Each structure stands twice: as structure tokens, then as C-alpha cells.
A protein has these predicted regions:
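Aromatic pocket-lining residues of Rossmann-like dinucleotide-binding sites
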Residues: 30, 181, 236
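Short C-terminal tail/terminal secondary-structure segment
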Residues: 245-272
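Conserved mid-core segment of classical short-chain dehydrogenase/reductases
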Residues: 55-57, 63-74, 78-117, 135, ...
Length: 272
């Protein structure tokens, strides 16, 4: 069901790699809610080609950009405004990558070049997007920027390694830039801390199935799906959340507020 929440709005959606991507679902939802937007991803991700199907479904243009390259982000914001015919109302940052995780490196055996790369791709890229947008004055008054995070920013999860610091940094950038951009142009900046979700980035983490199931049994509402995340993100892009900014918003079925659930207790009692 469409509510027309984003009628007349222009956006930029990053990170749609394939149908499982959270950004893919956000794009479909934003389209359904009446938005027009451009799609972007790292040039290397384009080779897989799936994004073209999404672009067709949404009537969107694809503008490749490596989110760590300021020059490419300048092109992204400039061309998006040209294609869409005006300033941008919403931006989705849905970007994460850690080579240490991909290569199963333990927290006590991290490669520091990869560590810095993970921070650059997964966190600093949000700052680069915001600073580029501000310098180009590319985001409209009252616009909304959302980045996706994970609760490993607050709590330790052994296999999340350097991405835990990336997410802590991402959330901190959202607060600091949220203050600046809010004062300057009423632009909101928030992070949405999402449940474990079966995507390329998600399932790349070793032990993913176990902690997906653990989170599901801990959360009174169960894990939030990518589609449900898209529903939430769309409200944050809409005019219904005009005074929400500088927040890390949990979208996790209640996981972040639970100490232990009856289900986990029962499971451990059975084992004991
Ligand atoms: N899947 C989960 O369990 C989960 C949970 C909480 C938060 N998140 C976050 O959600 C976001 C989206 O991830 P996803 O789970 O949809 O997985 P995904 O693999 O579908 O998306 C990650 C995207 O990042 C893009 N990317 C990587 N390097 C890039 C670069 N240099 N420039 C531009 N784009 C680049 C990839 O091409 C890909 O499209 C990430 O920030 C992720 O950390 C995921």
C-alpha cells in the first residue's frame, strides 16, 4: 500500500547490489511512495549488472561512484541534481565493506591496511558524502540523510571485528554532521541500527546464521527484515519525521533493550 509519503521528493540511494540488499528494498519502497531518485554504487559493483533491473523498475538513472572518492561524489551530487531537476531531499548511505571480515581475520590478527580501508568505505564515506553535499549546496532545506548501522557499535560481537569501530564512527559522524547541517540548512542526519539481515555484506560475517538466530530469539518482535527496514527508512525521508535528527535509531524488533529472553533461558536450561 502506498501513502504517497515521498511524492515530489528527489533522492540518491547508494548500496543496491542485488535483490537482497537493504538499499534495493529502500529503492522499491521509495519508488512506490512517489520519489524520484538516482541509484549509485562502486563502479566495481556495477559489473554484476543487477542494479540495471532495479533502475528499470524504478525509472532511475545509475551514477557510478566510489564513496571513498570525493571527486566521484561531487559528480554524483551534481549529476543527480541535473537528472532530477533540483536539489536532493534524501540520501541513503547503505555502504559497508571489511576485507578483514571477508578474509576471516580474527580481532587479534587484523591487517591494518584493510582496517583503514574498512573505516574509509564504511564510515568516513558518510562524512565525504555530507561534506561534498554541503559544499555543493546539493541538499534541500529540511532534507534527510540516513545511514545504516549495527549494534556492534555499542556492544561487542566477536566476529564483527573492525566493522564495530566503523559503525561507532559512522554513528558519531551522523551526530556531528547532524548538528552542523541541522543548524545550517535544517538537514536531518540519522543512523538506523538494523537487525542481522541476509544480504551479501551480512552473510559474509562468520557465524552469521548463529547470531541471526540468537537475535531472532532475543527480540520480542523477532528480527526486522530488509523490507521492514525500507518501510522505516522511508518514514525518515518523509515530512512525518521533520524533527528527528542526530539519532541512532534501533530497528531490531526490541533486541537492543533485552537482557535475556525466556527462549534463550529455556534453550540453555535444556543444554545444562
Ligand atoms: N546485513 C546485515 O545484517 C546488516 C545489519 C545492520 C546494518 N547493515 C548495514 O547495511 C548496509 C547495507 O548492507 P547490506 O546488508 O544491504 O549488504 P550489501 O552487500 O547488499 O550492501 C553493501 C553495499 O556497499 C557497497 N559498497 C562497498 N564498497 C563501496 C564503495 N567503495 N563505494 C560505494 N559503495 C560501496 C557494495 O557494492 C554494496 O552494494 C551496510 O552499511 C551494512 O553494514 C547490514
Amino acid at each position: 500500500m502506498s501513502f504517497g509519503l515521498l511524492n515530489g521528493k528527489r533522492g540518491i540511494i547508494s548500496g543496491a547490489l542485488d535483490e537482497a540488499s537493504i538499499a534495493w528494498k529502500v529503492a522499491l519502497k521509495a519508488h512506490e511512495e512517489g520519489a524520484r531518485f538516482t541509484l549509485t554504487n562502486a563502479p566495481i559493483a556495477m559489473r554484476m549488472g543487477a542494479i540495471k533491473n532495479l533502475a528499470e523498475q524504478c525509472g532511475a538513472e545509475i551514477i557510478p561512484a566510489d564513496a571513498t572518492e570525493v571527486g566521484e561524489l561531487e559528480k554524483l551530487f551534481t549529476q543527480s541534481q541535473e537528472v532530477l531537476g533540483g536539489p536532493i531531499d534524501f540520501v541513503l548511505h547503505s555502504i559497508g565493506m571489511s576485507t578483514n571480515i571477508r578474509k576471516n581475520r580474527e580481532y587479534g590478527d587484523l591487517n591494518y591496511e584493510w582496517y583503514l580501508k574498512a573505516l574509509d568505505v564504511s564510515a568516513l564515506s558518510l562524512h565525504k558524502m555530507l561534506q561534498t553535499a554541503e559544499k555543493l549546496d546539493a541538499i534541500a532545506e529540511g532534507g534527510s540523510v540516513v545511514a545504516l548501522s549495527y549494534i556492534a557499535a555499542q556492544r561487542s560481537f566477536p566476529d564483527y571485528t573492525d566493522m564495530a569501530q566503523a559503525k561507532a564512527m559512522l554513528e558519531s559522524i551522523a551526530r556531528s554532521y547532524g548538528y552542523r547541517y541541522g543548524k545550517k540548512k535544517g538537514v536531518r542526519v540519522n543512523t538506523v541500527s538494523q537487525s542481522p539481515t541476509r544480504t551479501t555484506a551480512g552473510t559474509g560475517i562468520s557465524g552469521f546464521d548463529a547470531f541471526f538466530e540468537y537475535a531472532n530469539r532475543m527480540s520480542p518482535l523477532g528480527n526486522a527484515t530488509a523490507e521492514e527496514c525500507a518501510d522505516y527508512v522511508v518514514t525518515l525521508f518523509s515530512d512525518l519525521t521533520k524533527k528527528v535528527t542526530m539519532q541512532n535509531l534501533y530497528h531490531d524488533g526490541g533486541f537492543s533493550s533485552v537482557g535475556i529472553s525466556a527462549e534463550i533461558v529455556e534453550l540453555l536450561e535444556k543444554k545444562g
